[in-house]
Amino acid sequence: MNSMIISCAISVCKTVKEKFKASKLNSAIERVYSVISRSWQNSVITRAVKTENSKTKNSILSRVMMSPFTLLEKISVKIGDKLSDRIEKSVICELCRSYVQNAMALNSRFMGIMALSMSIVYNILKFASTGYINKYIIILSVVSAFFVIFNVNIMGFCNTSKLVEFIKHCLGFDKVSFDFWDDLRTTGRIRLVAGAMVGVLTGAVMYVSPIIGILVPFAVFGMLLVLQYPVTGVFAAVFLAPLISFSSMPLAGVCVWTLLSLVIHSLCDETFKWKREGAGVALLLFLAVLFVSSVFSFARMDSLVVWAMYFVFVTFYFAVINLIDTKEKAYGLLKVFAISGALVALYGIMQYVFGWNTSNAWIDEEMFAEETMRVYSTLANPNVLGEYLLLVLPVSIVLGIKSKKPLTKLVYLAVSAIVFVCLILTQSRGCWLGFMVSAALFITFYDGRWWMLAILALAFVPFVLPDTIMNRLMSIGDMGDSSTSYRVFIWMGTMGIVRNYFMGGIGMGEGAFAKVYPLFSYNSVIAPHSHNTFLQLLVEGGIPALAMFIAIIAVFFKNTHNGYRVCEKKSLDSAMLLGIASGVAGFLFQSMFDYTFYNYRVMAVFFMLIGINIALSGIVTRKRS
């Protein structure tokens, strides 16, 4: 019965589609779309974007800003071979490589030795201080000894698992194999020494702090894995950015370690050339301007701490464009990005359904008395969550509509639905408008003929969305809403700061803003920032900081366009470049109503996504040329 209904529905849809294609209305839409498309292609904007500016690349300023990378290349030419040879022959480095390979393989003997060493050290320290031993650790020792008897790579069983194959197929990772370790390093004694050393360290740390001690083997593995394969650090950063909810410092640590690992690899390879294309010069100038404003800040130390976080997350762009050098890596990273976003969105939906840790602190209770809940998931604030989802949603949609395998298509369309529902539940009006901007740009450049469908869909929106959502939408710009009037008063006060400090700014961060803003505030409104990213950059770094940020965005869209125009129309590459650019545009639109860089993790994701898109654009451009 169900199959008959589905078949009838598909048949009706096909009939309507064919009738519409043959209609005069479709012919009129085709003609209008063709005229607009030709006009855009011949416009001044398009011609300006197509123009290659080699003078900028070869300018003195560009060479100065890129001199650290030039210096690294010169050093690698002189010492690359010697350094690589020493690392290859080093016993310590061999221990590290063996640890990584056996941990990836989940070698039973290796894990048994590590757990046994940890158990013995922990109980020795426990007995020495208290006179007692932990019986559970004794049981772990017995189990560990049993594992030592066998020498099996447990991860190898994943290759033959039907469940694992099904999951890989659903997520679009069919080519990923679980035999990624070096078999030669899963035999011999040196791996056991490596396991025992980490086990001893784990046992000692566990005696002081059990929770931290348990994390030691994983932390050591992660650090050594990134040191051996720096690209894994990029994947880890993209996946973990929204999930580590308690602090931005772990993410900063991953980014710093990945950059250091990349530098070490570049020094060991005399043929390594740092990629300089894209927004690199503008990003470094942006950091330089903000550094100067921080040095002369009203709260110097606070500003320098904020600048240090900016430095880490902005320079991570260079790790992305240098390590993501193939389409497989780029799309693998984008899939990881979408999966991470789906987990964040799913948790947000569960917050709404089960009422977990929700609050009405972000709702004007007088104007929206029936609304009591806005979800924020792992990002502590509904607006921040919405800003993150604005970047995720276009990526997941493109993965859904362009996937060739039906099951993979279904999974990423489901991911898109989850992310979209969570975006609605944030009740962030600015983010809703940002998504509309993203959708409008994507439809216009992907296939303008979709506008008819989009307009029809918009006509049904009032009948589908709940009254609470419609009330929020209709309240946009209403000064009776406290959140709207609050922002307007903050902007008025911020403009007072700009008028007095437009050249150099007041310095970065809340500390400097808190010292200066009260002198210009309206209606005694207290605020930690200006609720507008462009205004905030103008306040913190003056006109030079805002100019550099606009330059970054301009270069980003220029690189995106250069990649887009060499791609086949409606291909996966062109759709993804367009999707990411649309997401960034929606994010920038929301930036007019909130300080979107206030949350470091969202700021990090923004610059990572810029790096991914520029890397993908470079890949398709080089392949074409």
Regions found by a protein language model. Name each.
Residues 1-292, 298-305, 325-331, 335, ...:
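Transmembrane signal-anchor hairpin modules in multi-pass inner-membrane enzymes, especially those
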Residues 109-155, 188-208, 216-223, 258-259, ...:
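Alpha-helical transmembrane segments of multi-pass inner-membrane proteins
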Residues 125-130, 239-247, 538-541, 572-615:
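Membrane helix-loop boundary segments at the extracytoplasmic
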Residues 158-170, 367-375, 431, 458-493, ...:
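Flexible juxtamembrane loops connecting transmembrane helices in multi-pass membrane enzymes
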Residues 298-321:
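Alpha-helical transmembrane segments and their immediate interhelical/interface regions
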Residues 301-305, 379-383, 426-430, 527-535, ...:
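Membrane-interface catalytic loops of GT-C/OST-like multi-pass glycosylation enzymes that act
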Residues 469, 477-492, 496, 500, ...:
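Long extracytoplasmic/lumenal interhelical loops at the membrane interface
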Residues 542-553:
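Hydrophobic alpha-helical transmembrane segments
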